[in-house]
Amino acid sequence: VTSHSEALPLTIKQIDSKDSELKRSGAYQLTIDPKGIEIAVSDSRGLFYAAQTLQQLAQTDGQGNTTLPLGVIKDYPDIAYRGTVEGFYGDPWSHADRIEQLRFYGKMKMNTYIYGPKDDPYHSSPNWRKPYPEKEAAQIKDLVKEAAANKVDFVWAIHPGLDIKWTDEDRINVLNKFGMMYDLGVRSFAVFFDDISGEGAKADKQADLLNFLQKEFIEKKEGVSPLIMCPTEYNRAWAGSDYLDVLGKTLDPAIHVMWTGNS
């Protein structure tokens, strides 16, 4: 694609299709023919993805001439959340690693990065109630900006279940921590209750906290994505009917629940 006087036109327009798939966020139709290039998109994410495809299709020969194949590509996502969870134990990724990951996700049309390294003490115990120090807070801001530039939703997760007290004070502590992260630019949030036992693993208490956050934060803050939760029992092999029944009956249906399947 060039601005040279002899260049063929590049046309960008809103997609006009009866196909419901092409109306999903990130969908696009790319047409390359002898008359030029036309990109029809559903939203800005679709335009970004079409640009990635153009770059991936371009071939440059030994003389520096770049060509594109002729054809029509209809591309749309089948899965709403496409990405990774940094939720492992051990040394977390470095800041540079995360930046590199976010750029890779954009190129591969992945739209979700969930920040939840278990060895980040401000994500989990003992410091989940406290604000991030200045350096780490600045890095979170950088990650949010880089994610947005690559059309990736940066989801910040909290993991309070190891030492949470089911009190009004700790409920407000979670709410306040979400507010701190919102002020750093975060607009997507998750609560993780995995890898815990005892008091923190009570389904009714978890649902009560999540419903509180849904009402007092998610529904009140501008531009916030649906709340995500990871249950303590997140697959069929580990899950007891009592735990899942409580969540199913009491959890606000607007909250998205992570589930890994049979195992």
Describe each model-derived feature in a short phrase.
Residues 7-8, 34-36, 79-81, 110-111, ...:
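Short coil/turn connectors at secondary-structure junctions
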Residues 84-86, 91-225:
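Substrate-binding cleft of carbohydrate-active enzyme catalytic domains
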Residues 1-79:
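Contiguous, structured surface segment used for ligand recognition
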Residues 19-22, 166, 237-241:
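Short, solvent-exposed polar/charged micro-motifs at secondary-structure junctions
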Residues 13-18, 40-44, 87-89, 231-234, ...:
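Structural motif
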Residues 62, 196-263:
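Catalytic-core regions of glycoside hydrolase
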Residues 38, 155, 190, 226-228, ...:
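A structural signal for isolated positions on well-ordered beta-strands in alpha/beta enzyme cores
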